[in-house]
A protein has these predicted regions:
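Charged/polar low-complexity intrinsically disordered segments
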Residues: 7, 22-25, 44
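Structural and coupling elements of P-loop NTPases
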Residues: 32-34, 42, 49-741
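Generic short N-terminal amphipathic or hydrophobic helices
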Residues: 13, 23-25, 35
Length: 741
């Protein structure tokens, strides 16, 4: 990495070089023309001095990055490698052994996957890098949305064994939607069956010349990766006992390096018209021009550097961190936010170290022992004595104890500076998405855009009488995972939990037991069917009871008929001659209202019914409201079996977004679900949106089934549309199931 008479980034070399010429300002990065004296650096790779996590860094010396990618692509292993290479840990853990820093939750250890975002701070070359390791499993996309709110840039991880996966495509889309600067890191380059070239070429084919190779592997004669090449400097490195060592470029590899260097130059040329002209003229670019082009391209989203390595051997980890420092934005240069003021107007909220204190709560951890509110300081500096206003509630909040988190380990600190990420303890009234502001400037940043829940199940305790414990536990879990919803359905008498998939709900059930000591089980959510009659009938109801003294007497004739005006009962009176006194009419209506809560077929509510009281009789002594109410119920029960009752089912409006290649499978599946295709239209991303109407009873597992059919590339929305009659061949089973319940 050391050379003579080369222009280099000052952050990497000021500790062992002499500045000889003028400073050139490039955006927010300062570059120098320097003369390098080959000498021993003041730090040694693999043995960096461990900085105190309690150190408060200036905003320019902070990077907040999130690791995104498909499940199993190597994100947590990469974070472990970075921790080791910066001296934060003495030994790297393994996911299979359940001893990594990032996956410390008991459920993560048991399942060998990440289910929430872990924060691991690194201290490297006087800079703090907050790494946010996100889950790759789609069921836990809510945690990814939270991390994207806190990060200023992203590293998209994909495996050289698997190539571009749907998880990588989704991560790229998330970054595109947020205009987030990003790197691509190709992992596992030294493992069997890996194919770096195929993976890189696939990136180039999909995303064009914006893909810029910065670090590439070196292979030996047996196609085994033995090291990496810094394309910009044309230098080669290998790992020896987890130490990086510079090596000679292997014989015959010069052409490969030149090829990748030309590809990098082409990508840099895309960032500037003058550079593009010079590129076509065959001119070489100086090192400073290459760095400037890379930096500009990353910031303007016109260039995406590609690095590679192996987390197991730590190959490429140092070069990745160097690139993070040199090319990715600090919090001031990163994401801008839309803020809503107290009067409802919006403004650009700019991260500012000199502004009044403010912070955004982007994540919550809540268990039986307490609560941590993870924050990103957006402006100013905060201390335990700082009092801020919660923009959502309007209440004052004294911050109290503050921490820097590293996995599950909390280290108390005395202050957090602008742009940094930390946590607040025991903020009971604060929740994810809250903006904490100085009273002089109260603004609210927008909420985190969680995906709408698409998979629902009923949940109940295994031991009756513990329903309140289940509800209390789920409400606590909802504090740390707002991506799921919980509804008590009064009609079906079920507690219904909705999320992104079966894995998410299964984790919640496991956490109920481990954290709150309550055993619960999932079961299909009942469908809220309705009943309706198709024929007009007349019925007589008489309630007569004599028990000594005054008795009860009520006698009614009622005409029941179907109506389409509304779901609610329409009640009318056509009695003439005072056969039923008017003061008993409300009792008759009340009796019918009670009766229609249960239909004659399966006990589902009756809808679309009209009832006309047209005759009856009364007793001057024994008639009362209760007697006429009971008479109306008897008339209803007599009439319904003769009125051609039928079942109605809820029908939903479905919009499925899929690549065209899955069209046949999706359409065929919808037909099996009794769906009606209403139309097909292209969207702006080159996919097709299939509009359909489908019975809700057929959609219980659709989220899982669509994921399987489309390799998780499909998405859908489903909203209730109306009730329709259930085909006769399906009614008998529904009725039988209802009676069994």
């Amino acid at each position: 990495m050391f050379c003579t008479e080369r222009q280099v980034c000052v952050r990497q070399f000021t500790q062992f070089c002499n500045v000889t010429k003028e400073t050139i300002e490039i955006g927010a990065v300062f570059m120098y023309n320097v003369t390098i004296r080959v000498s021993e650096p003041t730090w040694k790779e693999g043995s960096f001095p461990k900085g105190e996590l309690t150190t408060m860094y200036t905003v320019n010396a902070i990077r907040n990055i999130c690791l995104l990618g498909h499940s199993g692509s190597g994100k947590s292993a990469l974070a472990e490698s970075l921790l080791y290479m910066t001296g934060a840990i003495d030994r790297m853990g393994k996911n299979a052994d359940g001893n990594t820093v990032c996956d410390s939750d008991p459920e993560e250890i048991r399942r060998h996957i990440s289910i929430s975002t872990a924060v691991v701070p690194l201290e490297y070359k006087n800079t703090k890098i907050n790494v946010l390791d996100t889950p790759g499993a789609f069921d836990f996309s809510g945690a990814v949305m939270e991390a994207l709110r806190a990060a200023d840039a992203a590293i998209l991880v994909l495996s050289a064994k698997d190539g571009i996966t749907v998880g990588f495509e989704k991560a790229w889309k998330y970054c595109e939607e947020r205009n987030m600067p990003r790197f691509v890191y190709i992992s596992k380059v030294d493992e069997d069956n890996s194919d770096y070239n195929a993976t890189f070429n696939a990136l180039r084919e999909k995303y064009g010349n914006k893909i810029a190779p910065v670090v590439v592997p070196i292979w030996d004669e047996s196609k085994r990766v033995i090291g990496i090449i810094d394309v910009l400097n044309k230098r080669a490195y290998e790992m020896q006992k987890l130490k990086r060592v510079e090596i000679e470029i292997p014989e015959g590899k010069e052409a490969v390096i030149t090829e990748f260097n030309d590809a990098l130059k082409e990508a840099v040329a895309e960032t500037d018209e003058e550079l593009m002209d010079r590129f076509f003229e065959g001119d070489d670019f100086t090192y400073a021009e290459m760095i400037k082009g890379l930096y500009t391209g990353v910031r303007e989203l016109s260039l995406f550097p590609v690095l590679c390595g192996s987390a197991v051997s730590c190959l490429g980890s140092l070069m990745l961190m160097d690139s993070v420092l040199d090319l990715l934005p600090n919090p001031v240069q990163g994401n801008y936010h839309k803020a809503t003021k107290a009067d409802g107007t919006t403004e650009e909220f700019v991260v500012s170290p000199g502004g009044v204190p403010s912070a955004y709560v982007w994540k919550t951890v809540s268990d039986q022992y307490g609560k941590y509110s993870y924050i990103k300081v957006l402006s100013g500096e905060i201390t335990p004595d700082t009092t801020l206003i919660n923009a959502r509630t309007g209440e004052s909040e004294k911050l109290g104890r503050m921490y820097v988190m590293c996995g599950k380990k909390a280290t108390e600190v005395k202050a957090l500076g602008c742009g940094d990420i930390g946590a607040l303890g025991k903020m009971d009234k604060v929740r994810t998405g809250d903006t904490l502001c100085d009273p002089r400037k109260v603004v609210s940043l927008k909420q985190i855009p969680y995906a709408p829940p698409c998979y629902s199940m009923a949940i109940a305790p295994k031991v009756k009488g513990q329903e309140d414990k289940v509800g209390t536990g789920l409400n606590r879990l909802n504090e740390e995972d707002p991506s799921f919803t919980l509804v008590n359905n009064a009609e079906t008498h079920q507690m219904v939990i909705s999320g992104q998939g079966d894995q998410q709900l299964d984790v919640l059930v496991s956490k109920l037991k481990s954290r709150f000591g309550v055993d619960a089980e999932l079961m299909p959510a009942k469908i809220a069917y309705r009943e309706k009659i198709k024929k007009t009938v007349e019925a007589h109801g008489r309630h007569k009871k004599q028990t000594g003294g005054s008795g009860q007497f009520g006698d009614v004739w009622i005409r029941f008929s179907p109506q389409e005006e509304q779901d609610e009962l329409i009640f009318d009176v056509e009695v003439v001659g005072g056969a039923v006194p008017k003061n008993f009419n409300p009792a008759v209506e009340k009796g019918i209202q009670e009766a229609i809560l249960k239909g004659p077929l399966a006990g589902y509510p009756m809808v679309g019914l009209k009832a006309v009281l047209y005759d009856g009789s009364y007793h001057p002594v024994d008639s009362n409201e209760m007697a006429f109410k009971m008479a109306a119920i008897l008339a209803y029960k007599e009439a319904m079996p003769n009125a051609m009752p039928t079942l109605l089912e809820p029908v939903g409006s479905l919009a499925v977004t899929i690549p065209d290649s899955y069209m046949g499978d999706v359409i065929g599946d919808l037909n099996k679900r009794r769906g009606r295709i209403m139309g097909m239209n292209p969207d702006n991303a080159g996919n097709t949106v299939v509009d359909a109407e489908v019975p809700m009873a057929e959609m219980a597992t659709y989220a899982i089934d669509l994921r399987a059919m489309t390799q998780a590339r499909g998405s859908f929305t489903l909203t209730f549309e109306r009730y329709e009659e259930v085909p006769k061949q399906y009614q008998d089973k529904i009725i039988a199931d209802a009676k069994n319940d």
